[in-house]
Amino acid sequence: MRKKILFVCGSMNQTTQMHQISWYLGEYDQWFTPFFSDGLLGKASDMGMLEFTIMGKKRAGRAIDYLVSNNLQLDIGGALHNYDLVVTCTDLIVPKHIKRSKIVLVQEGMTEPETILFHLARNFRWVPRWIAGTSTIGLSDTYEKFCVASEGYRDLFISKGVNPDKIEVTSIPNFDDCERYLQN
């Protein structure tokens, strides 16, 4: 039996990035889901209150359309299987049942500037990371590895408090293919 991987998608950038990463892991049983949450945020999403986020129905619909058009297996909410590995582009929200699996976090792109909300979220665990946006990516420490774009980003995340032993410089699939733009 092949080991199972769940790819947690979101925006189209995140979704296409997860798809590209999956190409290198063809020996695994791969499943995909739009971004989701549990608890209060999950309920708010179900009620349509988070349409401005990657948990909104419109963005989830776009992700699902893309995944279906590429014949990828869907597991909406990641509850069909016990996954050996979860690959995601954000740890701002980590659903409880995902925490039972090994997680690889992949940097999606640039991070937002550090504001007072960043410092609150970093210094007080009761302040949710999502309130500070992408400036707090990597601070959950719920992952086995955090794949980042460059040495510069590695240094940035370390300065924010990310465990250096968990960071791997791998580049970012959607932004590291200059050759495809030679004939645009």
Feature annotation, model-predicted:
Residues 6-182:
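Active-site and donor-binding regions of nucleotide-sugar-utilizing enzymes
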